[in-house]
């Protein structure tokens, strides 16, 4: 697990990025990976951690644990040849240039994302070490004094693009292959960051076969400047919307509207959909 600072609607969380889960050949097929991941997810819930995330080498390893894709890889169709380019191989953390790079990246990634990895100096220092360890480098493109694009490359045998971020003033961000998977570990904590343009009061039922603490009903009350999320024993005769946790994750992150859900006891089902 690698810790990162993640901004969720402006609130900063220390969340764990799962780098890899692997089992030695002689220990495979004995349930070690499942028990380890189950324990991690349950512990995160007890610590009110809203979610964990990863970039999968093989999505099929993580689908049984109710991870869901929430984002695609950023792609930019842009010609940067007309901009002033600097190639950086040794950037000292906390120098002026490092601060400029961080400011540029955070400004760009926050424009269209309510949830994003917040780059602080600790993050950048670790990033520089990773790039350096594989003989990598950074490209910075400027228009006048302003950074308009950032690229990082790495690879001992074959140089590969690690990340590219381009200013929205010169290029429109497009989306490539599915990239990031998320596993919500505390529904109530995650939803507490949301706001609604109109007041809502609705019950949702989450089906979670791993994190039993959130295999439950939640009453969601929300408005422009408040959110109150409470777990309740049952819905009784009240209307509610039911999701499996993976479907809820893909839907609430705005990645996929076409997920499975059940609308129960609503006279007018459009009310549930609008909420």
Task: List where the protein language model places each region.
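A conserved beta-turn-beta hairpin within the catalytic core of GNAT-like acetyltransferases
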Residues: 5-18, 28, 156-162
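Hydrophobic pocket-lining residues that define ligand/cofactor binding sites across diverse proteins
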Residues: 27, 44-45
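C-terminal hydrophobic structural anchor segments
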Residues: 201-251
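C-terminal interaction segments
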Residues: 233-275
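Conserved active-site alpha-helix within GNAT-family acetyltransferase domains
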Residues: 46-50, 56-74
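Conserved acetyl-CoA pyrophosphate-binding loop and the N-cap/start of the following alpha-helix
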Residues: 27-39, 170
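Hydrophobic adenine-recognition pocket in adenosine-nucleotide-binding enzymes
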Residues: 21-23
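Amide-forming acyltransferase catalytic core, primarily the GNAT-like/NAT-type
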Residues: 72-202
């Amino acid at each position: 697990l690698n810790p990162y600072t993640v901004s969720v609607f402006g609130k900063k969380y220390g969340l764990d990025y799962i780098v890899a889960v692997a089992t030695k050949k002689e220990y495979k097929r004995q349930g070690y990976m499942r028990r380890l991941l189950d324990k991690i997810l349950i512990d995160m819930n007890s610590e009110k951690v809203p979610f964990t995330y990863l970039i999968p080498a093989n999505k099929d390893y993580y689908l049984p644990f109710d991870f869901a894709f929430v984002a695609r890889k950023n792609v930019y169709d842009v010609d940067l040849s007309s901009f002033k380019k600097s190639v950086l191989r040794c950037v000292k953390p906390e120098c002026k240039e490092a601060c400029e790079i961080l400011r540029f990246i955070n400004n760009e990634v926050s424009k269209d994302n309510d949830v994003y990895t917040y780059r602080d100096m600790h993050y950048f220092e670790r990033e520089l070490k990773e790039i350096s360890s594989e003989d990598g480098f950074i490209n910075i493109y400027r228009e006048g004094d302003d950074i308009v694009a950032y690229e990082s490359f790495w690879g001992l045998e074959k140089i590969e693009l690690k990340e590219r971020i381009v200013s929205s003033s010169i290029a429109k961000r497009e989306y490539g292959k599915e990239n990031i998977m998320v596993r919500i570990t505390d529904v109530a904590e995650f939803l507490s960051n949301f706001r609604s343009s109109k007041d809502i009061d609705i019950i949702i039922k989450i089906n979670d076969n791993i994190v039993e603490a959130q295999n439950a009903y939640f009453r969601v009350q929300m408005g422009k400047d408040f959110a109150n999320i409470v777990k309740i024993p049952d819905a009784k005769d009240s209307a509610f919307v039911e999701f499996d946790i993976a479907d809820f994750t893909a839907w609430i992150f705005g990645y996929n509207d076409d997920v499975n859900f059940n609308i129960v006891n609503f006279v007018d089902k459009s009310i549930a959909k609008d909420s």
